[in-house]
Amino acid sequence: GKGNVIRRMFREIDAECYIMIDGDDTYPAEFGREMVTKVLERNVDMVVGDRLSSTYFEENKRPFHNFGNSLVRGTINHLFKSNIRDIMTGYRAFSYQFVKTFPVLSKGFEIETEMSIHAVHKNMLVENVIIEYRDRPDGSESKLNTYSDGFKVLKTIGRLYKNYKPLGFFGMLSALLVLIAAILFIPVFVTYLKTGLV
């Protein structure tokens, strides 16, 4: 899986700057220079190649991927008070500090979500670079399954939110349980007011 490859790469390679790019010919390589410059000269810890602010929604022919990207981005930015414009992009640059402090837990495509949350939670410097996006070449099929991998990503967000912000996670869970209890209690209470019986 993708996460396993990233784990081994980060463990075995020592460098001042790392670039991660998907091998499906959807990301133009020329944006790499600007991303590397931000890491080496401006001490940025993670540079995010932002597809969503340029050509992604025009080029990508998979509508549920578009919806999923927007959902994941909105959820993470809301829960973690961040402003990462493209959570799921496979085009990123990293500093040595990021790579050597990142505990790779995911095995598959949810790795990008984990990277984004790690950087935000550790107060690392994150910047976005708007990049062009091309749809996959004809005959090239994505290994990403919209539904099963989408569910894994949402599950990863929930797990990491619980680990990084337990008060917020269990506070929301408690509020939900209180709401359910109140809904179940109201009919019983109304019956009691009318009849005096429970």
Predicted segment positions?
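Acceptor/aglycone-binding surface of glycosyltransferases and processive sugar-polymer synthases
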Residues: 2-13, 17-20, 29-109, 135-151
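Hydrophobic helical membrane-anchoring modules
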Residues: 34, 81, 105-107, 111-198
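Short beta-strand segments
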Residues: 21-22, 130
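Acidic metal-phosphate-binding loop of nucleotide-sugar-dependent transferases
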Residues: 25-26
